[in-house]
């Protein structure tokens, strides 16, 4: 049976939230990436938009875990997500773009659901697959803080690439997606899944990749996507950040 990249990204995406008073909350999305340390130790990395975490004033947010029951049911069980220690951010941000990453301790089922680092597009993926204006992409998130059901799964939405050119990435680090971006979408993955099925005996989906992170809404209600290569770069910065954080 073929594995669907869409389902795998739904399973790897989580809600991030923090109460903001008067019954309101700051809500966004993040997704988990399996990115082993340089010495080969397993590591689960949470990827999201930097502005989402910066908007949260308290040191602790909540992350929306989901757990499967033996009868096919699902249970939504949000848990604590420390994002600062005594006011100092625990996440690492890309120095130029709205991307944030942090190493987290995830439940075993979520550590298994984390997508491989290799699924993130690199600097040649768009050209290799001929991606351009009009191509359909998908994103998952929590628009206006809503989930697809009480189990806390994200909502899937689609849009088309709405800008040109999209490469070279060094000159065009973001691209536009024709989708109405609402509060709660920020930080979610944007991906190509037209050919995103994995054949038995192969490791990765064919012709599918995570194109970037949804990071901004324009006044035209068009989404701004930051290319995934900058997620890769931010993850590389994690090792230095972790060393500096040691007492």
Stretches found by the model and what they are:
Residues 176-213:
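Catalytic nucleophile loop of clan PA
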Residues 5, 35, 126-130:
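Short, surface-exposed secondary-structure edge patches
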């Amino acid at each position: 049976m073929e594995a669907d990249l869409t389902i795998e990204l739904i399973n790897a995406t989580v809600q991030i939230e923090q109460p903001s008073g008067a019954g309101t909350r700051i809500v966004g999305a993040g997704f988990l990436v399996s990115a082993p340390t340089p010495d080969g130790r397993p590591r689960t990395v949470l990827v999201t938009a930097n502005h989402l975490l910066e908007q949260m004033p308290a040191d602790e947010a909540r992350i929306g875990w989901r757990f499967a029951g033996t009868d096919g049911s699902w249970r939504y069980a949000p848990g604590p997500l420390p994002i600062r220690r005594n006011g100092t951010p625990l996440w690492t941000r890309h120095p130029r773009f709205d991307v944030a990453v942090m190493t987290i301790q995830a439940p075993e089922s979520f550590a298994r659901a984390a997508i491989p680092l290799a699924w993130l597009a690199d600097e040649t993926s768009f050209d290799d697959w001929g991606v351009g204006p009009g191509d359909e992409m998908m994103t998952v998130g929590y628009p206006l803080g809503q989930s697809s059901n009480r189990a806390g799964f994200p909502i899937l939405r689609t849009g088309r690439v709405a800008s040109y050119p999209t490469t070279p990435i060094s000159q065009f680090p973001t691209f536009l997606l024709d989708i109405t971006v609402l509060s709660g979408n920020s930080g979610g993955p944007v991906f190509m899944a037209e050919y995103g099925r994995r054949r038995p005996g192969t490791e990765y989906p064919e012709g599918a990749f995570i194109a970037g992170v949804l990071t901004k809404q324009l006044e035209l209600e068009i989404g701004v996507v930051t290319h995934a290569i900058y997620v890769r770069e931010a993850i590389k910065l994690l090792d230095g950040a972790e060393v500096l954080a040691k007492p």
